[in-house]
Amino acid sequence: VLGIKEIFVIRHGIADDATDHNDIDAERQLTKKGREKVKGVVKYLQSRRIRFDIVVSSPLVRARETAEIVNNACSRSRSLAISDLLMPDGSYDELITFLNNIPEEHVAIVGHEPFLSGFVSYCLSRSSMPYVRMKKAGVACITCDDPVVPGDCVLAWLMGPAQMLADE
């Protein structure tokens, strides 16, 4: 019996400019507004009873900070994994192999543009030409048979923080 994997693709929240941290992109942190938006998005996910079995994050600070907020609020296991597969220059196929090798069915991945929109497009169509746009703190939910096969996934929904925070 094929299982279903639900992958929640989450872009990090608003971060400060590289210049605030000696131009080290990897160390850019979420701004106060960025944190607040991520917390609002998390509230929305909670209101929809969305729970993750695992949260996987890019190692860059702004993604990790986003992932920690998501993990603390929406993770069943409080299991936060850090993976270079979600770096801005990651490989879609390697990320899919990773997803196929973990038992968890409800997975949140936290990373960066344009990698994430390319990944969503690749899962839906086998083309990495991004035809979805991920806003900062935006979430895309894609469903796939397990194992995940590029081109065989379905986009369940995609929202930016403005939609998720609309009824606050």
Report the location of each language-model feature.
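Active-site-proximal alpha-helix that buttresses catalytic centers in soluble enzyme cores
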Residues: 2-90, 130, 134
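Generic beta-sheet signal
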Residues: 7, 104-111
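Active-site catalytic microenvironments for nucleophilic, acid-base chemistry
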Residues: 44, 69, 73, 101, ...
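Hydrophobic packing residues within well-ordered alpha-helices of enzyme cores
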Residues: 66-70, 95, 119-120
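Short alpha-helix plus adjacent loop in nuclease-associated cores
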Residues: 87-99
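Domain-level recognition of soluble alpha/beta enzyme cores
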Residues: 127-154, 161
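Short, cationic low-complexity segments
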Residues: 162-168
